[in-house]
Amino acid sequence: MAIQYWEDSLSAADVQALRKNFTATARPALAGLAGGESSGSYLNEGDLLEPNFQVTFFGPNYARLEKIKAVYDPKDLFIVPVGVRSEFWDAEGMCTK
């Protein structure tokens, strides 16, 4: 288990730097120990910086979830960062790539 915390008084830029460091160093190290990228991750909420969120958060279910989303939301009206099909949207969720 890896833990990253910060004081509430820390600036937003410093918090972002801590999150980036965790995503770039601790998470890959833990994935290597746990048997690879399909081992999963949990940071109290989906880490917006997670580079492989499809596998990390959804695992083998991602393809099936894409099909379900295509039925109920064919125009991708409902999107969230690091959610199903969010990789086709810009970082602000305003425009498709």
Where are these regions (language model features)?
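Cofactor-binding catalytic cores of oxidoreductases
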Residues: 1-97
